[in-house]
Amino acid sequence: MATNITHHAGITRNERNQLRKQKGLTIWLTGLSASGKSTIAVELEHQLLQRGLHAYRLDGDNVRFGLNKDLGFSDADRNENIRRIAEVAKLFADSSSIAITSFISPFRADRDTARKLHEVPTPNDSTGLPFVEVFVDVPIEVAEKRDPKGLYKKAREGIIKEFTGISSPYEAPENPEVHVKNVDLPIQEAVKQIIDYLDSKKLLDA
């Protein structure tokens, strides 16, 4: 890390919150491929926007077309993938937006790093930013049966290496803020669980 740089602080987060009439936070969806993360994230974004809240969704596949197109799927690259996304999500949250991330993020340590990053106050602010971990939980058998992209089949055939749940581990969250058991659960109910939690913590209040 460079040592000859300084952080240029401008307006405070509280000033931004007042201007946008909302607080910023990050909602971090994690789970196996085909668990339903992206589908839930899309509907969650829509519902937040309908409530007049500024939200932005960061999706695992989409980000790899741009910001993270130089990364593969080794453990080191997965770590860097999540580190970058955590930094970007924090920027959105610090701007008084609601960042919704939808990434497998298989390693517990990486998710903990993302959380701790949000807990560190930015210059000019005395507190960190809310970080809400949402575990979209389905058994591997269910995810593999869904397999909309045919990725599990390719992983079983050895075409895709280091595939989470097959040849690379997924470390389930131990204490997520929201635990969505997404087997035969209507999308509206899955999103309701998340919004109910946010409302209970007054995270969507101005």
Curated annotation (Swiss-Prot):
This is Adenylyl-sulfate kinase. Pathway: Sulfur metabolism; hydrogen sulfide biosynthesis; sulfite from sulfate: step 2/3. Keywords: Amino-acid biosynthesis, ATP-binding, Cysteine biosynthesis, Kinase, Methionine biosynthesis, Nucleotide-binding, Phosphoprotein, Transferase. GO terms for biological process: cysteine biosynthetic process; hydrogen sulfide biosynthetic process; methionine biosynthetic process; sulfate assimilation; sulfate assimilation, phosphoadenylyl sulfate reduction by phosphoadenylyl-sulfate reductase (thioredoxin). InterPro entries: APS_kinase, P-loop_NTPase. The keyword Transferase applies. Belongs to the APS kinase family. ATP binds at G31, L32, S33, A34, S35, G36, K37, S38. Catalyzes the synthesis of activated sulfate. Its EC number is 2.7.1.25. HAMAP family: Adenylyl_sulf_kinase (MF_00065). The keyword Cytoplasm does not apply. The active site is at S105. It catalyses: adenosine 5'-phosphosulfate + ATP = 3'-phosphoadenylyl sulfate + ADP + H(+). It is an enzyme of class 2 (transferase). One of its GO terms (molecular function) is adenylylsulfate kinase activity.
